[in-house]
Swiss-Prot record:
Assembly description: Heterotrimer of A, B and C subunits.
Family stated for the protein in its record: Belongs to the GatC family.
Protein name per UniProt: Aspartyl/glutamyl-tRNA(Asn/Gln) amidotransferase subunit C
Record keywords: ATP-binding, Ligase, Nucleotide-binding, Protein biosynthesis
Domain of life according to the entry: Bacteria
Annotated organism of origin: Cereibacter sphaeroides (strain ATCC 17023 / DSM 158 / JCM 6121 / CCUG 31486 / LMG 2827 / NBRC 12203 / NCIMB 8253 / ATH 2.4.1.) (Rhodobacter sphaeroides)
E.C. code: 6.3.5.-
Catalytic activity: L-glutamyl-tRNA(Gln) + L-glutamine + ATP + H2O = L-glutaminyl-tRNA(Gln) + L-glutamate + ADP + phosphate + H(+); L-aspartyl-tRNA(Asn) + L-glutamine + ATP + H2O = L-asparaginyl-tRNA(Asn) + L-glutamate + ADP + phosphate + 2 H(+)
InterPro entries (UniProt xref): Asp/Glu-ADT_sf_sub_c (IPR036113), GatC (IPR003837)
Amino acid sequence: MSIDIETARRVAHLARIRVDEADLPALAGELSGILTFMEQLNEVDVEGIEPMTSVTPMRLKRRQDVVTDGDMQDKVLSNAPDAREGFFAVPKVVE
């Protein structure tokens, strides 16, 4: 598929990018190259091929889902300019 200069201008406008008039032919050529490559990918027979997310099989390491308090309340609140009863104290913003 070939992209003309007017289509390249429209794509740039829709993408909200400014492209100088002198650069439009190069942009049209690059977009045409991308679409040509996509057309080549569409010709590949992938029937029966299982999709993959990585070339090496990986498994996520799992850990127990245990609820804790984090043992960091004092540490975190020590950075607060104002803390009361274990919470951050902030100025009232709604009357």
